[in-house]
Amino acid sequence: MRQTKRAFLEGLSAGLQSGGQIYVSENGRPVFEEAFGEVRPSESMTTGHLLPWMSSSKPVAAVAIAQLWERGLLALDDRVADHIPEFGTRGKESITIRHLLTHTGGLRMLDVGWPKAPWEEIIAKICHGRLEPRWVPGQTAGYHRTTSWFILGEIVHRADGRSFDQYVRQEVFEPLEMRDSWIGMPVETFTQNAERLAPLFDTQPGVPVELNWSSEKRVTRCSPGANGWGPARELGRFYEMLLTGGTWQGVQILLPQTVEALTARHRSGIFDKTFRQILDWGLGFVINGSNEDSRSGYGHWPSASARAFGHSGYRSSTAFADPERDVAIAILLNGTPDENSHLRRMRAITTAIYQDLGYA
C-alpha cells in the first residue's frame, strides 16, 4: 500500500494531521491496517487508540432505526409525532422518520446545547422548535448536523425502552465485536480509557491547537450523530457487515433487503442548502455521486463506484463501502484543517487506496 502511505505522509508533512489510522478490507478480509504519526507530541499513534468519528457516527443511528423497522416497532413513513407527540407543533407536524434520515426535515438551525444540556432538555428544545421558513418536508434538503439525530435517538428510546447509547452498544457494537466502539461512552469507561482517547487538533494555518472534543462531557454525553469513538478497524467492520447483507461472521444485524433499502438512492439530484451543492442520500448514508456535480463536493471517494455508500465526519474522518469492489474503508485523522485542504487530503488518500488495490 505504498501510494496510501505516501498520501497520508504528505498530509502529515503539510501539517494537516499529526497522526491517524487507516483500515481497508477487500472481500471481507483485512488487507491494510496501520497507524501513523503521533497521538500526542512524542507519543506514537497505535491501532489501539480510540479516535472520534464525528458525523461518521450517523449511519449507526440509521441501522438502529432499521432494526426497529424490521421488528415492526416503527415505519419509515411514520410521522415523528406518532412516536414523540410533543414534536408535532410549529410546522413540524408532517415530518416523517424518512425525512430525518434523508436530511429533508427542516430543523437545521436549532442550537441544542450539547454537551452541557442533558438529553431530556435537548429533546424538549427540539420539540419546541419551529420548522425553517419556506421549507417543505421531504422536498427541501439541507444537511442536519445534530438536531434530527437526537430525535432519531429519542425514537429508538421510546420504541425500545433503552437509551440510544445502550441500544447501539448492545444491538450493534457488541454483536459485531466492536468492543472499543461507543456513542456516548459510560463515565467509568471514559476514566479507564482516558489515555487511549486521541485528541483532535485544529490544524488550520498556524500552530496546531488541541480541541476539547475528548473532554469527559463530549465523550460521555450521547450525541447520536456526532460523538462516536473507536478504532478505524471497528468502524470498517461496521461496513463489512453491510457489504455482506447485514451479517458478520454468522451474526445477523439486518436483513439483506433492509441493507438494500438503507443504501439505495432515496434523494437524488436535490440541492443541499447546507453544503450548497447537489448531494445524493440513502437513509442515513451519503451515496456516491450519480453525476460529476455530486462527486465533486462533499463526497471524499472519487475513485469509488456510484454505488458506494458511507459518511464522513468534521474535517477528520470518512468511512464507506463500495459494493462493486467489495471494499470497506475507514480513515480517522487527528487534524482538522480548512475545508479545501481536508477535501484534497481525503480524496488523495482514498484515491491512493484504490490505486494500491488496482482499481484506479
Which residues are covered by each model-predicted region?
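Short, conserved catalytic-motif segment at the N-terminal edge
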Residues: 1-54, 75-78
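Short Pro/Gly-enriched beta-strand edge/turn motifs at strand-loop
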Residues: 3-6, 299-306
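Short, surface-exposed loop or secondary-structure junction motifs
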Residues: 29, 90-303
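Short, well-ordered beta-strand elements
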Residues: 31-32, 319-320, 326-335
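A short, polar/charged loop-to-alpha-helix boundary motif
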Residues: 40-48, 338-351
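Short, glycine/proline-biased beta-turn/loop segments that scaffold the active-site neighborhood
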Residues: 75-90
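Short glycine-rich, acidic/polar surface loops and turns
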Residues: 306-308, 313-321
